[in-house]
Amino acid sequence: MAEIVKTMKLHIHPQKNDIAALTELTESYQVACNFVSCYIFDHGFPLNSVELSKLLYQTLRTEYGLKSQLAQSCIKTVIARYKTIKDQLLNHPYSYQEKDEPRQYITRTLDWLQKPALFSRPQADFVRNRDYSFVDGGSVLSLNTLQGRIRVSFDVPECFKDYFDGSWKFGTGKIVSLLGEWYLHIPMTKEYGKEYSSETVKHVVGIDRGLRFLATTYDEQGTTTFFDGKTIMQKRDVFQAVRSEAQSRGTKSAKRVLKRVSGRENRWMTDVNHRITKTLVTKYGQGTLFVLEDLTGVSFNEENISQLTKTGRRQLRSWSFYQLSQMLTYKAHETASEVIKIKPDYTSQRCPKCGRIRKENRHHDIHEYICDCCGYRSNDDRIGAMNIQLLGTFYVSGDTNPKLKHKEN
């Protein structure tokens, strides 16, 4: 059975006294998380929840006032943060290059951290049926606080109603406050009867991600689709200009502006990625294999993107490529389709007609690939999508680790 995971963000409406209780809880939880984080940092990064619970549980109960389940959740929250950091360090090794020597790579571990992980935002993790539960026929939320349980109403927009039909399993939620409003973020899982099978693939779609075109796709029918990124980047430049102006002032009001702009930009970027991925999944439907480049470990340092302008380098580093792949994955799973990631080696350098691989054949200044062997010429992003799609066909044929190999001509 295939499983899909989504996060529902419930807008809750606590009363004035309840807001004080939630504020006290989330602030205490934040301070407690920073205490646990410092302990882990100072003691060689132990990440076993059972052992940490034996050492820190009583302190969290007595000195920070957390209830039993919240104390356990606090430890797990911090462990999860360090495991995420550990994965990030592993996927982005330190690199250096001495004169006339090949570039060297060193795997980074948690020992590379210079200071403990910081929890800067008041929030708390709520376990289903312990810290939060739906009561009164599912119309009211019962929430745990340091002062006892409270009952709050919540909004159920039309797009959320299907999540309450009994087919979704709710997990550990996160209570947060944003601009004076309160939200409970609940991850949900659901099993689907239909599951992707390589034996019933109808479409193989290669997707090249970038900035000039946020996504360029190429399918088994030879159809190419470009998702223009020019207007998107122009709007991001407007956000950046507002941020730069606010940062130059450095006042408290400027910091509030920065916070609002950041939230607005993040929501807008999420919507852009949502619309792109929804378009792709709707267009191709069930039984589609979407193929992406695995950008894990790809370095956006000055050396690798030196051909870009300063603005281009900033845009490349900050665009949410990872979020797009996440959204595409869960949307694909809903339609019994699949997303795979392939090695990006040579995808932008290979001629899809004769197989010639040559870096110089890609001309960034005119955004074209011109093969010096057979003369084939096309948009450089399209070339990338074509090669990515080819690797997808190898995967369908049984090659679980498809990659392009350098072909001498």
PLM regions: where:
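Nucleic-acid substrate recognition interfaces
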Residues: 1-409
